[in-house]
Amino acid sequence: MSTNEGSLWGGRFADGPADALAALSKSTHFDWVLAPYDVVASKAHARVLFRAGLLTEEQRDGLLAGLDSLGSDVADGSFGPLVSDEDVHGALERGLIDRVGPELGGRLRAGRSRNDQVATLFRLWLRDAVRRVADGVLEVVGALTTQAAAHPTAIMPGKTHLQSAQPVLLAHHLLAHAHPLLRDVDRLADFDKRAAVSPYGSGALAGSSLGLDPDAIAEELGFAAAADNSIDATASRDFAAEAAFVFSMIGVDLSRLAEDVILWSTTEFGYVELHDAWSTGSSIMPQKKNPDIAELARGKSGRLIGNLTGLLATLKAQPLAYNRDLQEDKEPVFDSVAQLELLLPAMAGLVATLRFDVDRMAELAPLGYTLATDVAEWLVRRGVPFRVAHEAAGAAVRAAEARGVGLEELEDAELAGIHPELTAEVRDVLSTEGSVNSRDARGGTAPIQVARQLGAVRDTADELRRRLRR
């Protein structure tokens, strides 16, 4: 049987909790990351208690000095949780009482509950974590834009259904991975509008009768506002679910980029060579160079999705207000952040060091009759309805396949036999360079549009960095 010595609760109980309950309730193994935020919030709470007339100036200063000492010891690792500590809050109160005594240390608990306390600390931690993750995503975007800028005219096979479709610029394809990552960062920046609301002062669920000032503590802690509803403030974790969704979406977007790298690095594709420092070998096959970073990105995306779904399952069907189920809200989010902080620098390094075989990509770009659409559109420009033009281009492909030649190698008579408008001049559009250059509307793969797009992506990344620092 455990005791309640040092616990934040217990007066109503004759005995401490059973050992199995104490073990089940324990959370210091994961919530200790909140300790620095708890110390900062406790300082703000001490000042609010003083302004409410619940502490003398001497008591306030004594608490602040004790919290300063405790914060320093937490930062350098000389103070940490004991086996007997239930959670980060109890451990820190124990540390404060060790420094200032039980009479003064016990005064800090006035007007706050672990319910509003942990909801506030979780938001503080997550707002900082989101900025770190966003910075990491922008590093990957930076690697993509640098590679795009280094290959402004390289042509590659564009694919749908993993089948050769139309020629595109390599830079266009790389930027297609940058855009969703920028949207992820935009979501993280927008997330802060909803996360920047302070639950402090909500108490267990009903607010406080002690004349506290939730707006003052919200401002001191860097929140935009205090919560309007104390029940919602202590019981809601939609902010955590929102962040977990964006983290999982980042994982999905990185996984799609990773899949391209994996395919491109195969012998069959041969588009890229992996840098030695960003790949691994085989324990038995000496020739192997494995895309482990990309494969781990695929694997971790599943983990991130699992964290999101696990959190949502925890949140569903809880009655208002706070329930102990919410002890399970933090580990999935903490883990998602930890995984992304491992993955993002590795992905940025992988992308930045890819060596592209642009000759190989250019050689493969026209294969599979990828210029058939150009034939159809050439006919449309000559007044042929697209349905008819599509049929004619398909017939030209069938004829070329039957002879084992390219579209440009069909005889004039063969072209005319397919459609009277298919004259020898159609060969003018049967080059990958001409195909790419012709797609010069906004969003297209023409070099002029891709150059504009590259500048816009870089501008967007710079603006997102500024938003994240506000």
From Swiss-Prot:
Enzyme class: lyase
Record keyword Cytoplasm present: yes
Similarity comment: Belongs to the lyase 1 family. Argininosuccinate lyase subfamily.
PANTHER family: ARGININOSUCCINATE LYASE
GO cellular component, one term: cytosol
UniProt keyword annotations, A-Z: Amino-acid biosynthesis, Arginine biosynthesis, Cytoplasm, Lyase
Catalytic reactions of this protein: 2-(N(omega)-L-arginino)succinate = fumarate + L-arginine
Domain of life: Bacteria
Pathway: Amino-acid biosynthesis; L-arginine biosynthesis; L-arginine from L-ornithine and carbamoyl phosphate: step 3/3
Keyword flag Transmembrane helix: no
Compartments, as annotated in UniProt: Cytoplasm
Signal peptide bounds: none
Name this polypeptide is given: Argininosuccinate lyase
A matching Pfam family: ASL_C2
